[in-house]
Amino acid sequence: NELYELCAENEIGMVLINSNEAKRTGDDSLEKMKEKANAEGYKMPYLMDEGHLVADAFGARTTPHVFMFDKNAMLAYRGSIDDNSEDKNQVTKHYLKDAINAMSKDETIDPNITRSIGCSIKRVAQ
């Protein structure tokens, strides 16, 4: 929610998209998504990517995998939220936060690409 608030302050939209198609009957079911959104106090839309079409179109490989676009709908940042997906207390680099701050000041985002870290997106055969 801290990142959502930072985006809102800078008139940047945010949406979460769940693309784990192969786990729809378990932890990534619509009901579990609603429970997580409520428990975490999400204020942004949390959407289900049916058939992982959005993930495939963007080339997303992991959860999370960030894609941030500028006001001209150009990809401005792609990659990880930060440098530690397992322990938020061990984070030393805040990639997305830095990218949001740079974008809000019309500064160059550096780095504008980082390696996405997290669990792989669970796709189904089509």
Regions found by a protein language model. Name each.
Residues M33-D70, L75-A76:
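Short, internal strand/loop/helix patches
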Residues N1-N38, E50-A55:
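Structural microenvironment flanking redox-active thiols in thiol-disulfide oxidoreductases
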